[in-house]
Amino acid sequence: MARAIMLQGTGSDVGKTVLVAGLCRAAKKRGLKVRPFKPQNMSNNAAVADIPGDNNHGGGEIGRAQWLQAIACGVAPSVHMNPVLLKPQSDVGAQVIVQGKVFGEARARDYQALKGRLMDAVLDSWAKVGEGADLVIVEGAGSPAEINLRSRDIANMGFATRADVPVVLVGDIDRGGVIASVAGTHLILPEEDRRMIVGYLINKFRGDVSLFDDGLKAIEKFTGWRCFGVVPWLKAAARLPSEDSVVLERLASGEARALKVAVPVLGRIANFDDLDPLKAEPQVEVVFVPPGKPLPSDAGLVVIPGSKSTIGDLIRFRENGWDRDLATHRKRGGHVVGICGGFQMLGRRVRDPDGIEGSVTEAEGLGLLDIETMMEPEKTVRNVSARSVQFDLPLEGYEIHLGRTTGPDTMRPSAIINGVADGAISADGKVIGTYMHGLFGADAFRGKFLESLGIKGGGIDYRVEVERALDDVAAELEGHLDCDALFGLAR
């Protein structure tokens, strides 16, 4: 079995995902066969990964974070890297994905009772990920200090103690109170869990690190733990795909550029990293529009992203007045792209007679495409190779969706996937819908698409940019963490 080390946080969004990705890349550069692992993730930003030994299945779902971490390791993503994925459908319920496949749906209280049964799947995947690896770097979820959930925990100390994996605690100094967060975690953890922690690190530091020397001494006094380093705010991390929708709350529009792309932040937004390749283009400004704010009138393109609750988000789309903004945008000659759930919303109607996504079984669409969607229980999950109909260029991406879409505008498909038409295009060519995620990740297509909107010189090599960002993050960590000591404590 491979040696392992685990990063757990003093809270959510402390930067564990980027740290694990950077450490994975640093270990890879040392010549180690390294793999990522996250026992349980909660995200509607999913990726399609291989299901080892299942040659007849199109693929399974994992969190995009583990997909990125696998890329950092230089290996193909596997469903075993994230055996339990929770995809929120409401404030109190989520779809449960186990080893890539839909296990069922559970309300928050029911899921707590279910977690004990899921530990077997977690440990099975854990054993598989370690096969042939030298090192596995594990990412926790939330915080081990949530001691009210400890008895059935599979994400943090529940896993670490069962798998005997040493833990490094991550504190986020940017949000304030990091001394209390680290010392408080030490205080309330039971002795069995406290023994698993071999040290800590401070993340997202800004300014002169020497000003925190007394803080480090205070943490050592209260905990006795070793500090592996103080990591600065990593600018390179902004060039990596984002997984957590928390980041959308903090994204400002930035400097004005040649093309403004408006993205309404849906309540159950999914796979919003579809926009990352556009964000990386020097002439493109991507603006995420929060609920209650109008779609900007100077946007040349509106992208409606995926959704885990299409009908619910369609209803809220109208409540925000975005349907009126979108109609005005179209009257001005603006372009619209709908991806997956966003594609379904662009039609005349969405029907869900079996209540697969919720209690509301039907909703009027935005009417920009002459199509209708019927939700069906079987989910499509697969990586795809396709060809753009508009530009006759190759595309690479993936599908994760429920529902079947029909109607006159599907006679003008946006892509051909394995010989089958996908999506729809309006008669004037300015409204495009597709089920294919990753559309903008195809450099040649993205360049031609931007050219059709009047933007010349687009189509940067996005994959190369991601690889460079991973290298830069790893280099920053090497400069501020004792990576040799950290890897040396893995067991």
Swiss-Prot record:
InterPro entries: Class_I_gatase-like (IPR029062), CobQ/CobB/MinD/ParA_Nub-bd_dom (IPR002586), CobQ_GATase1 (IPR033949), CobQ_N (IPR047045), CobQ_synth (IPR004459), GATase_3 (IPR011698), P-loop_NTPase (IPR027417). Residues 258-445 form the GATase cobBQ-type domain. Disulfide bonds: none annotated. One of its GO terms (biological process) is cobalamin biosynthetic process. GO terms for molecular function: ABC-type vitamin B12 transporter activity; catalytic activity. Gene3D superfamilies: 3.40.50.880, P-loop containing nucleotide triphosphate hydrolases (3.40.50.300). The active site is at 340 (nucleophile), 437. Pathway: Cofactor biosynthesis; adenosylcobalamin biosynthesis. CDD domains: CobQ_N, GATase1_CobQ. Keywords: Cobalamin biosynthesis, Glutamine amidotransferase. Belongs to the CobB/CobQ family. CobQ subfamily. NCBIfam families: cobQ (TIGR00313), PRK00784.1 (NF001989). Catalyzes amidations at positions B, D, E, and G on adenosylcobyrinic A,C-diamide. NH(2) groups are provided by glutamine, and one molecule of ATP is hydrogenolyzed for each amidation. This is Cobyric acid synthase. It comes from Mesorhizobium japonicum (strain LMG 29417 / CECT 9101 / MAFF 303099).
